[in-house]
């Protein structure tokens, strides 16, 4: 998580589609300094009671005001993080992705790379073609406002089963 390569790759992922934003232009112009800033921020973000070299540099989440957006016929409540917070999210995802993907059900779709709607559609079509009973219907389910209902304590307990690094769990 602290490697320069991971921090730079996360930024490369973050900036896709955002290259006109002022903060992205600034980071592009000062990339080496900003990568070091992210490194120092992560290094100085530790659980309470753990000594750090410079606690003022540690990550402190901002208070966000929810924003309502209309997307794909749905109303969504989102929280827009500041650019460095987004960058940290991308770093966390880079580290978590192989852990989560490796233990997920192989037909979980939607939130995994290369397992979107087209992947799900192809799987269902394959099952329907090879079904000896001649099934012609299936049910597509979307849990309304699912992310709002996730219990953080349960999520963190499940992550702790797969991740033994207390510091990384704290950053999450």
What is each residue range found by the language model?
Residues 74, 114-127:
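Short acidic (Asp/Glu) patches
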Residues 2-18, 61-66, 93-99, 129:
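Short, compositionally biased low-complexity segments
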């Amino acid at each position: 998580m602290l490697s320069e390569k991971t921090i730079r790759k996360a930024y490369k992922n973050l900036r896709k589609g955002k290259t006109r934003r002022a903060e992205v232009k600034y980071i592009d112009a000062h990339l080496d300094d900003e990568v070091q800033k992210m490194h120092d921020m992560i290094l100085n973000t530790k659980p309470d009671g753990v000594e750090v070299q410079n606690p003022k540099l540690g990550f402190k989440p901002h208070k966000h005001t929810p924003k309502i957006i209309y997307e794909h016929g749905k109303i969504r409540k989102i929280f827009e993080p500041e650019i460095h917070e987004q960058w940290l999210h991308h770093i966390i995802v880079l580290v978590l992705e192989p852990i989560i993907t490796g233990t997920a059900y192989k037909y979980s779709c939607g939130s995994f790379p290369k397992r979107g709607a087209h992947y799900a559609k192809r799987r269902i079509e394959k099952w329907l073609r090879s079904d000896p009973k001649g099934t012609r219907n299936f049910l597509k389910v979307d849990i309304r406002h699912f992310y709002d209902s996730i219990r953080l304590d349960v999520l963190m307990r499940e992550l702790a089963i797969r991740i033994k690094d207390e510091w990384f769990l704290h950053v999450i």
